[in-house]
Regions:
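Cysteine-centered catalytic environments shared across enzyme families
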Residues: 1-204, 208-260
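Alpha-helix initiation and N-capping motif
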Residues: 23, 34-36, 46, 97, ...
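Active-site lining segments that contact anionic ligands and/or coordinate catalytic metals
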Residues: 143, 297, 512
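ATP-dependent adenylate-handling active sites, centered on carboxylate activation for C-N bond formation
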Residues: 65-70, 85-87, 150, 157-419, ...
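C-terminal non-catalytic accessory extensions
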Residues: 492-526
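PAPS-dependent sulfotransferase catalytic core
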Residues: 415-504
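Short, motif-level signal for alpha-helix interfacial/capping segments enriched in acidic residues
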Residues: 55-56, 361-364, 462, 466
Length: 526
């Protein structure tokens, strides 16, 4: 793709990996080729020139005169960078963690397990800060960059969201601002595929985030697109996704996950997502995407970072100081918090919502992006800088308590609001009626009764792991075999934690956490 750069002249070495949605705008502004535009941006703005870029990217600049390396990622880190530097000044970096760990191994540098990082994965399902599972190997945090001169490395931030609130706006004005920013983000993504002649992939589920994207794309005239979903068959997710696709007229493709096969590719998933989160997180996404012809498809539009229905990832204490014991955002249910389950970035966020928006939304939720990038270019319009700024400038109370984002859908996309939301069984339009709230309460009570009676119903969940394993005992046999073959790779407290997670009566997802960490040892530490 012509968005990428790998070139040099007498002054600079330029490396840019990614999809730049405003490339043509920048070429016009700086009156030159893409390479010339990037050089002018750097010469005018210095080490924070990447502030002008929009899209999915990471990159590096070497300034030959200043003998300075600059490394950077985009504001939400869709294309991560990993790096190592020791007290001797030895440095390595790469867009995949194995590039760094393989370089360490080739140079005789010992690769030691980071107990803090791996403990966080075993509890939360993901890393909680810039750490990895390897000591001295870090991941560049979203919106950060590195400046390296000789043996000196300095980490700085060029972009971070803040909870600055717009005041004095009416509900309708907030909605207009959200909609304008969102439509512009989707428009840029569609136009990028049009630039290269690719079809756009639109993920559709039973939720409302993906639905917002699909209806916006249709309103913008996007025709060269397909819609996809993957889930347990017979459930609400597939029925609602199909209804959305049929209503919009997009070709619709569905992959059933009934056989639970997404639990088997432990090593492949951990390798491709850099071991950054639980390996089952993508469920059937990889199996689906690898069926597609990569010559035909460009951007995959996902609803990650959305939370249109709830209005926030944090539905209580959103404006309080950040804390870690937010039970909603931990995959594990067996292990307790301990002295290793902490976060070194807790203090950089002003409130609880922002902390979890970055950790759960970007570090965990978007951990599947590097895996997807083997097949397509995943993007989320909810991660567009201008949209995020409007979103975060809208008061938390208004977004959550008054469900402003649901009202946005009802006002701007009324047809989408008349289709039920899989999680509640009611439509977003009914959310503001007594009848709708009553229906939601009845559904909640029914599900709670089933839970208390230990009745597993495949229709309630998009990815019913416990149901799959009950129906197919060979899945648990596989997980146990993988554990037995690899358990000696771990040691100390990590090994003890793995033993607890692999007991017969532990949930499947806890076992998946154990396998994730063992695969991490196998591929990045041994």
């Amino acid at each position: 793709m012509q968005d990428k750069l790998f070139c040099q002249n007498e002054r600079y070495i330029l490396i840019l990996e990614g999809v730049i949605l405003n490339k043509q705008e920048l070429c016009n502004k700086y009156k030159g080729t893409w390479e010339e535009a990037v050089i002018k941006m750097y010469e005018q703005s210095g080490v924070t020139f990447m502030k002008e870029l929009r899209g999915s990217f990471s990159g590096a600049v070497y300034d030959k005169r200043k003998e300075l390396w600059l490394l950077y990622v985009d504001p939400i880190s869709t294309k991560p960078l990993y790096y190592y530097m020791d007290e001797n000044g030895d440095f390595a970096c790469g867009t995949q963690i194995n590039y760094v760990t393989d370089t360490m191994k080739a140079n005789g540098i010992r690769r030691e397990a980071d107990e803090h990082g791996l403990s966080c994965v075993l509890v939360y399902g993901n890393f909680m800060d810039e750490c990895t599972g390897v000591k001295k190997v870090k991941r560049l945090f979203p919106g950060d960059y590195l400046v390296i001169r000789g043996e000196n490395l300095e980490k700085r931030t060029y972009y971070q969201l803040s909870p600055q609130k717009r005041k004095g706006l009416s509900e309708e004005e907030y909605i207009e601002a959200l909609d304008a920013a969102f439509r512009n983000a989707v428009k840029r993504m569609i136009e990028k595929d049009q630039e290269y002649g690719y079809k756009t992939i639109i993920d559709i589920s039973g939720g409302v985030d993906s639905r917002m994207i699909a209806y916006t794309a249709k309103a913008l005239g996007c025709k060269n697109a397909i819609s996809i979903t993957y889930s347990q068959s017979g459930g609400r997710e597939i029925k609602i996704a199909q209804e959305v696709a049929n209503h919009l007229g997009y070709d619709f493709y569905f992959k059933s996950l009934d056989n639970g096969s997404c639990i088997y590719p432990v090593d492949d998933n951990v390798f491709m997502n850099n071991g950054s989160a639980i390996y089952t997180g993508i469920t059937g996404g990889k199996d689906f995407l690898q069926l597609l012809n990569p010559a035909d498809y460009g951007i995959e539009l996902t609803g990650l970072l959305g939370d249109v229905y709830d209005g926030s990832m944090v539905v209580r204490d959103g404006e309080e100081e950040p804390y870690l014991e937010y039970g909603q955002y931990r995959f594990g249910s067996v292990l307790s918090y301990d002295d290793q389950t902490y976060s070194e970035v807790l203090g950089r966020f002003e409130n609880l919502e922002l902390f979890w928006y970055y950790i759960r939304g970007m570090i965990c939720g978007m951990s599947s992006f590097p895996l997807r990038q083997n097949f397509v270019e995943p993007l989320t319009p909810f991660g567009d800088v201008e949209f995020m700024e409007v979103y975060m400038s809208t008061p938390w109370e208004l977004r959550v308590k008054e469900k402003l984002l649901c009202r946005w859908m009802v006002m701007k996309y009324p047809e989408a609001a008349r289709i039920p939301y899989a999680a509640t069984g009611i439509t977003p339009a009914e959310e503001f009626t007594f009848l709708g709230r009553s229906k939601k309460m009845i559904k909640f009570i029914n599900q709670e009764i089933h839970r208390q009676l230990h009745i597993m119903h495949r229709g309630y969940l998009m990815n019913p792991f416990e149901y799959w394993c009950k129906q197919r005992p060979e899945i648990l046999e596989f997980m146990q075999k993988y554990y037995m073959e690899n358990k000696e790779r771990a040691d100390g407290r990590i090994q003890s934690k793995l033993e607890l997670l692999m007991k017969d009566d532990t949930p499947v997802q806890d076992k998946a956490l154990a396998l994730t960490v063992l695969s991490y040892y196998k591929q990045f530490l041994d």
